[in-house]
Amino acid sequence: MFQKRVDQVITKMKADGLKQILVSEPCSIYYLTGVDVGPGERLFALYLNDEGRKVLFLNTLFTVEQKDCEEIWFSDTDDSTSLLASVINSSETLGVDKDWTARFLIPLMEKCEGLKVVLGSKYVDDTRAIKDEKEIECMIENSQINDVVMERTRDFIKEGMTEKQVEAFILEQYKLLGCQDVSFSPICSFGANGADPHHMPDDSVLNAGESIVIDIGGRKDRYCSDMTRTYFCKEASDEYKKIHDIVRVANEKAEEIIRPGVRLCDIDLTARNYISSFGYGEYFTHRLGHFIGQTDHEFGDVSSTNTETVKPGMIFSIEPGIYLPEKMGVRVEDLVLVTEDGCIVLNKLDKKYAMIG
C-alpha cells in the first residue's frame, strides 16, 4: 500500500520533470511510509527522488519500526540539516512542502550552494486527494458515527443549556463511540453567535426562538469526519425558516451536480448563485467546502476560484451558509464521496428544518 502511494507520487514528479522532493508534513510521511511521529520542533523529513530512493530522517528520540526505506538517525546535538544536505543533489531542483519551516529550509539552502527550491507539496497532496479503498471505508464508518453523535446531540439540547454544556456532551459521545479524538473543537453556536462561522462555545444560554448551529467531527483510525446541522429552539420566525430552507436546498443542488469532470468552482457557484437569487449572497461569507482525510482541512477546496475538476475517490464537504450579523446563522454540511458517475453523500441524518429543545 505505501509503496504504491510512493510510486504514484514519483510518477507525478516525472511528469513535471522534477527529480527530487522533501516531504515534511507528518501526515504525508505517514501516508507514504506508515511511520507515525509527532516531531514537535524537531526535523522530520522524507526524501524521494525520481529513481525511487527513499530516505527517512528521524531523531533518535523517536522509536519506530523499521520500514522499507533508508533511515538516517540524528540526535539533538547533531546538525540535522547537514545530514539532509548530504543526500540532496544540489544541481537539481528540490521540491519542498508548502508549510516547511524556515528554520530548516534556510540552513539547508546555505549548505547546498546553488540549490533551486520550488513548492513540491502538490505531488503528495494530489495523491492524498484520491482516497483508496481502505481510506474510504474509514471515512464512511466515521461519518456514520458522526450521524449518531449529531442525532444524540439534537435530542440532548434543551432550552436553558449553555453552549459549553452541549460541547461537553458532544466530546463524551465521541469517546463512547470509539473515536480517538475530535477532528476539530466542536462548534456549538446559539442565536447571534451563529453569525460567526467558527464561534467557539461559551457560556451563552439557549433561548426559545434561537438558531442552533452544530458543526462536529470525530477522528478514528487516523481519519476525520465533519458535518453541520442547524436547528431552532422550540420556535422560529418565518424568515428563519425561509433561510434554513434556502441553505438546505443550496446544499442539495450542489450535491446533485457532483460527478467526475465537473469543476469545483461550478459546484460552489451552484450553491452560491441559488443563495444570491434570494438576496442573501453577501451573507454567504466563505467557500462552499474543503477536502478532508487524515486532517479536517486537507489541500484542496470547493471554491469559486478553483477550476480543478472532480475525480473519483475525492472526499470533500458541501457546506453553504447564511450568516446575519447580530441575529443568527444557518449552515448545512455533508461530506461527499465522488464515484465513477456521481457522488455518495456520507451523512444520512435528516437536514430539513426542525425545532428542538
List the predicted regions and their residue ranges.
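Active-site neighborhoods and metal-handling regions in enzymes and metal-associated proteins
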Residues: 1-357
